[in-house]
């Protein structure tokens, strides 16, 4: 840190002359800005679509939210007709898009392009308030290539994280009442996608306001006004948005799904605990191919806590060496970002870590700029890595083995033979809107335009799946005489070789009694057809 003082003084953002330049924005040449944003869109497009083939199939939790939105489009009520543990923001976004554009396979991919592009833009807004030069592009580029690319899964994580990034972009300039109202509302909006993230964003903001009050020796009246703006706007959005869904589903149903379930049963699945670190760890079949992925995994998991630990350790020296306005901006990122990490710490997984680490990436680049030649060399290495990944990652998608399927929801590019075989086999034996049930992972409902008649999106052999939910599945299969059911061999085995609360025995008995086996896929999943006598 021997070069801390002179470097920090050069990290304060764009100069006044740069800001007034007609050919630049915050000191960034217009051509560079356009290239950055257009390049981000192109990167995401080539990662989500195969040219002249179709939308790349993305397996992930987004398929649950898409299925739920289709159910809502057809008149079902979330939390009463079917289960969901997150607040309704994600389904609401997809529902609005389906009403406006129709149910199409490309819609979630379009959403992912928009989410990624806006995140890149917000990171740039924040970075330009802390530093100048080409390094302002690096946090967003690292986020895109090291993190976002690996989890192109349009779930609540990305929506809520974008809201929090917008909070930082709004407040980093100043904390006027109008800006605090907007920030509090955005924290509330984040909660409408991910309960704990919105709450922790507000906690981080409030901690910063208390710190600022003490550091600037503001009056209590000023502090109370700021708190009232933030908390008031937060509550207004949370109660206003969620209140409608609670009223429609019934407050008891809404509370059980979004609060009680999370407190009592969410951690019943090992993947929602610290064990997620082991579950996410890349499988090392071929070391030469997997080592880069392992390096990315370790970076994605570890960078946020490491950056915040280093930042707060050096914060006294930073406060002595930097202008007051810059210190305020850095502390805002530090408090809110660290609060977000605390929110995911009990169940750190790679997706959760990536979804909250963009503020940490901005701080990381700023810190490296402050550490003289060693920091500059590290930044060069990060630039080279990010630029290489920006070329290799979309190129790998475009040159990968692929097959095309013409589905009821659109043209789909499939990048693995198993997924292709599953879709083709089921497609040939079903028709759009037909009832169908997948036990473990809902991979086929949205793409094949099939309907899950049960109240749950998937089942587990843990306390995460409640006995009454299993009963609801059996009741729905019987009431609707569902013809095809797909079972998973993994639901016959306890996770990690121990009993986590398996309640599926009645369902196994029901399927064995009323269905007959017709197909086994290479991964062991089976399709069962209702016996002829019962149709």
Question: Residue ranges of each PLM-predicted region?
Answer:
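Membrane-interface transmembrane helices that cradle and orient dolichyl/undecaprenyl
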Residues: 165-182, 214-218, 290, 297-327, ...
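Short periplasmic/luminal acceptor-recognition loop of GT-C membrane glycosyltransferases, typified by
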Residues: 412-464, 470-496, 521-524, 528-530
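Short acidic/glycine- and proline-prone juxtamembrane loop motifs at membrane-interface regions
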Residues: 152-160
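Specific aromatic-rich, kink-prone transmembrane helix
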Residues: 159-187, 206-212, 360-363
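Membrane-interface alpha helices of multi-pass inner-membrane proteins
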Residues: 144-148, 180-195, 201-209, 236, ...
């Amino acid at each position: 840190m021997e070069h801390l003082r002179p470097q920090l003084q050069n990290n304060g953002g764009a100069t006044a002359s740069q800001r007034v330049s007609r050919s630049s924005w915050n000191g960034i040449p217009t051509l560079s800005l356009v290239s950055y944003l257009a390049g981000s869109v192109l990167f995401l497009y080539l990662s989500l679509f195969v040219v002249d083939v179709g939308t790349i199939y993305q397996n992930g939790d987004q398929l649950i939210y898409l299925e739920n939105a289709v159910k809502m489009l057809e008149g079902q009520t979330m939390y009463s007709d079917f289960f969901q543990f997150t607040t309704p923001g994600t389904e609401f976004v997809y529902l609005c898009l389906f009403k406006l554009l129709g149910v199409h396979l490309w819609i979630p991919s379009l959403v992912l392009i928009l989410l990624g592009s806006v995140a890149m833009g917000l990171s740039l807004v924040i970075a330009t308030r802390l530093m100048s030069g080409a390094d302002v592009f690096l946090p967003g580029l690292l986020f895109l290539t090291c993190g976002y690319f690996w989890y192109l899964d349009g779930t609540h994580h990305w929506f809520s994280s974008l809201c929090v990034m917008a909070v930082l972009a709004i407040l980093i300039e100043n904390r006027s009442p109008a800006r605090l109202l907007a920030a509090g509302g955005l924290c509330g909006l984040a909660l409408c996608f991910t309960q704990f993230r919105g709450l922790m964003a507000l906690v981080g903001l409030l901690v910063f306001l208390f710190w600022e009050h003490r550091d600037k020796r503001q009056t209590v009246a000023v502090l109370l006004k700021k708190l009232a703006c933030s908390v008031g706007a937060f509550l207004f959005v949370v109660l206003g948005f969620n209140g409608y869904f609670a009223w429609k589903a019934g407050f008891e149903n809404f509370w059980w799904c979004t609060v009680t379930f999370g407190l009592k049963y969410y951690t019943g699945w090992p993947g929602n605990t610290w064990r997620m670190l082991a579950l996410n760890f890349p499988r090392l079949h071929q070391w030469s191919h997997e080592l880069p992925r392992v390096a990315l995994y370790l970076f994605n998991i570890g960078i946020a806590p490491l950056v915040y630990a280093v930042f707060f350790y050096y914060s006294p020296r930073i406060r002595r060496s930097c202008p007051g306005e810059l210190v305020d901006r850095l502390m805002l990122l530090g408090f809110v970002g660290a609060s977000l990490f605390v929110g995911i710490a009990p169940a750190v997984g790679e997706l959760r870590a990536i979804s909250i680490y963009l503020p940490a990436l901005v701080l990381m680049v700023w810190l490296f700029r402050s550490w003289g030649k060693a920091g500059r060399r590290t930044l060069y290495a990060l630039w080279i890595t990010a630029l290489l990944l920006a070329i290799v990652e979309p190129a790998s998608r475009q040159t990968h083995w692929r097959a095309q399927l013409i589905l009821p929801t659109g043209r789909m590019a499939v990048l693995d033979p198993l997924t292709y075989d599953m879709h083709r086999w089921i497609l040939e034996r079903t028709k759009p809107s037909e009832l169908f049930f997948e036990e473990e992972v809902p991979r086929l409902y949205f793409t094949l335009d099939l309907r899950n008649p049960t109240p749950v999106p998937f089942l587990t052999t843990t306390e995460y799946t409640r006995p009454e939910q299993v009963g609801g599945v059996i009741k729905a299969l019987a009431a609707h005489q569902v013809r095809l059911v797909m079972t998973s061999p993994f639901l016959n085995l306890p996770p990690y070789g121990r009993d986590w609360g398996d309640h599926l025995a009645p369902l196994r008995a029901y399927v064995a009694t009323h269905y007959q086996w017709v197909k086994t896929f290479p991964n062991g999943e089976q399709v069962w057809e209702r016996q002829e006598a019962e149709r």
